[in-house]
């Protein structure tokens, strides 16, 4: 399922993704907050305490020579809400109990419309890898390969003005 793009009154944009997960909310919470589980699906290594509001965070790229960037935990309500600054973006993860597991909603507030298709495809791919990890199976594609598959869908859905910024650095040839 493709993500959605909304324009906010603040002049920013919000990417929204919803996934139904066949796992208890507590298991999904672990995947969102425990460093060893984040490594399986989150695009950077997170250094810092995700469970403490106000805590500083550092996001380090692995396998790519790119500078790290900073963030800060904004809100934590285990096991249903995690929100933090991710560089200039605000990432908000919400979990809700649902029949057969839980529902994950990821919202990424971005300040530049031209990033929407790129970032939308990126989060789509990361969430695919997260689902596979939760299911205990290997993802059929890496997040980068999955990004290549779904990027055009996001350009088509969000429009060319949402695709003025190219692929992530690690996918450039």
PLM features per residue range, with description:
Residues 12, 64-66, 88-90:
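Glycine-centered tight beta-turn/hairpin loop motif at sheet-sheet or coil-to-beta transitions
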Residues 1-45, 170-173:
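Hydrophobic ligand-binding cavity/cleft-lining segments
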Residues 16-17, 35-70, 79-81, 142-151:
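Short beta-edge strand/loop motif at the mouth of beta-sheet-based domains
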Residues 110-171:
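A conserved amphipathic terminal alpha-helix motif
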Residues 6-12, 50-53, 75-77, 96-99:
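Short, ordered beta-strand-loop transition motifs
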């Amino acid at each position: 399922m493709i993500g959605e793009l909304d324009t906010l009154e603040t002049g920013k944009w919000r990417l929204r993704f919803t996934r139904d997960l066949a796992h208890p909310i507590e298991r999904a919470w672990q995947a969102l907050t425990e460093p060893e589980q984040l490594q399986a699906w989150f695009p950077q290594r997170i250094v810092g305490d995700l469970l403490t509001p106000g805590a500083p965070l550092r996001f380090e790229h692995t396998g790519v020579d790119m500078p790290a960037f900073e963030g800060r935990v904004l809100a934590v309500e285990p096991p249903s809400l995690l929100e933090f600054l991710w560089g200039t973006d605000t990432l908000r993860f919400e979990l809700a109990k649902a029949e057969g597991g839980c529902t994950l909603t990821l919202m990424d507030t971005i300040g530049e419309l031209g990033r929407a298709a790129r970032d939308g495809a990126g989060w789509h791919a990361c969430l695919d890898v997260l689902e596979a990890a939760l299911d205990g199976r290997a993802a059929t594609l890496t997040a980068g390969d999955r990004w290549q598959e779904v990027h055009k869908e996001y350009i088509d859905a969000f429009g060319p003005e949402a695709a003025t910024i190219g692929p992530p650095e690690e996918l450039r040839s």
